[in-house]
Amino acid sequence: MATQKARNMAIKENDMRAPLKEYEAVQEAAMKFVKSVAEGNSKYARELFIDEAVLFGYLDNKLEHGSIEQFYHNVDTVPGGDHFKARVDVIALEETLAVVRVLEEGWGNRIDFTDYLLLLKMNDEWKCVAKAYNQNSNTIQR
């Protein structure tokens, strides 16, 4: 019993939860994504995503996958809309890895999304390497 307790304490001491300031830094980075979508301008997202970033998801039942350039095209051609809203949640954060969920409502005054962004800390800066998303089924245009 004492041995198990000692093991549990050792695990707890080695648990590498990131400091709160890192959560704030990740959220601030993810807000570049939100700002681009809201304004219909990929400029801010281009600061967040690395050139090799990939995306996967369905837009109006059509699979989009590959280069993040497709996302930039979508953002630059469809404004966020008057009723666009978003929420950013940091789901997981380790020393150099973060998973962020972005809930979007009313993109282009029509579509609701749930996005997951995978970020890596590179050269002391949080950068997005992948984006996967789900379009809420009640907003699919058929």
Q: Language-model segments: which ranges?
A:
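Short, low-complexity N-terminal intrinsically disordered segments enriched in polar/charged residues
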Residues: 2-43, 47-51, 139-141
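Surface-exposed, charged secondary-structure patches
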Residues: 21-25, 54-60, 65-112
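Generic alpha-helical hydrophobic packing signal
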Residues: 23-26, 32-33, 96-98, 118, ...
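Residue-level detector of alpha-helical recognition elements and their boundaries
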Residues: 41, 48, 59-61, 115, ...
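Short, hydrophobic secondary-structure boundary micro-motifs
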Residues: 46-47, 56-58, 129
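Short beta-strand segments enriched in hydrophobic/aromatic residues
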Residues: 49, 104-106, 132-133
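Short beta-strand edge/turn micro-motifs at domain boundaries
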Residues: 112-142
